[in-house]
Regions:
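Short amphipathic alpha-helix segments
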Residues: 10-29
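Proteins enriched for Cys/Gly/acidic motifs involved in redox and nucleic-acid/cofactor modification
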Residues: 78-109, 121
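Interdomain "pre-motor" coupling segment immediately N-terminal to P-loop NTPase/helicase cores
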Residues: 34-93
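Short, flexible turn/loop "capping" segments at secondary-structure junctions
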Residues: 32-35, 282
Length: 318
């Protein structure tokens, strides 16, 4: 058992209403934490006790500096430390979090998301591969917006393959814009979440931000741009090569996709799966992988994904 004394400032927030925050920390680390005033005792496995002590003392220090936290922020940080014991609270709250356009603060919610952000900041080409809901596209768009606002790039180009779920644009009703918009809607949603509506509209009108089907990139060279290819598992080998060779000087590219959700016709090779094999050892290119543990949607989504994966594995052994 470890006995520590914590300063009073922020202690009530740290523990939460009816000690709900501390109970959550106890469940994550399998420790017991009791407090009488400022005196706190921690009981459990020695390694877990040390981790719990560091969390409490680090948060107390941040509270002492005048920082404030919501219950959600506290619990997200608890979960990340439980996942990665080398996790730094101070770095997380002072470096990892960012506000791309002054509207909304963005923060990684898992170790893989932190790795992904760092990779995008440091490399010219990054592949984010994993199941839906892991923040691959949203974080890439957020970093693109930040790069644009900080004048690191002159424009943002967001692209998706225009063929998904077996539908071809030519067989859908309406004009081209009406046909294309549903496929690109997730990219618009991310932008509107990060930037005020009027500002996004102006940037789109000026083509500072461009959202288009992947086919529209053929024959172009994109310099000083932040380029994102979403749903890349639905590119063919030729399309992926075409996309990667569009990258010009001063540009950065992020490619996201889920290799378990390929909607290409039978016999067509996924460009994302091939790129993973062909490019994994090239300097300047990094692959970051996400699992169901990184899912940041409703907590049931993580459980649903895991259940389907287990079902798929069982079928493969029949």
């Amino acid at each position: 058992m470890k006995q520590i004394e914590l300063p009073p400032r922020g202690l009530e927030t740290l523990f939460g209403v009816h000690d709900q925050n501390i109970k959550y920390l106890e469940s994550l680390l399998d420790v017991r934490i009791d407090a009488r005033g400022q005196d706190v005792s921690i009981d459990g496995d020695p390694e877990d006790v040390v981790t719990a002590q560091r969390i409490l003392e680090d948060f107390s220090e941040l509270f002492r500096e005048g920082r404030t936290f919501t219950d959600k922020e506290l619990r997200e940080a608890f979960a990340q430390i439980a996942e990665d014991r080398a996790f730094s609270l101070r770095d997380y709250f002072t470096k990892a979090r960012f506000n791309p356009a002054g509207k909304k603060q963005v923060a990684p919610k898992s170790a893989n998301q932190r790795k992904y952000i760092q990779a995008i900041q440091e490399q010219d080409v990054v592949f984010g591969i994993g199941v839906a809901g892991t923040g691959k596209t949203y974080l890439a768009v957020a970093l693109a917006v930040q790069a644009l606002m900080q004048k690191q790039v002159n424009r943002i180009v967001l692209a998706r393959p225009a063929v998904e779920a077996g539908e071809k644009l030519g067989f859908l009703p309406g004009d081209l814009q009406e046909k294309v918009d549903p496929y690109l809607r997730p990219l618009y949603d991310a932008l509107f979440d990060l930037i005020d509506y009027e500002r996004v509209t102006k940037l789109l009108e000026k083509q500072v931000i461009e959202i288009a089907p992947l086919a529209f990139m053929r024959g172009r060279t994109l310099s000083d741009a932040f380029i994102i290819l979403d749903e890349a598992q639905n590119t063919t080998s030729e399309q992926m090569k075409m996309f990667l060779t569009r990258i010009g000087f001063g540009s950065k590219a992020v490619i996201t996709g889920d290799v378990t959700q390929v909607d290409l016709p039978t016999g067509k090779r996924s460009g994302l799966i091939e790129a993973e094999r062909v490019l994994k050892n090239l300097v300047g290119i990094e692959f970051v992988y996400f699992t169901e543990k990184d899912v940041v949607r409703h907590k049931l989504v993580q459980m649903i994904i895991k259940a389907y994966e287990e079902h798929s594995n069982q079928k493969s052994h029949i």
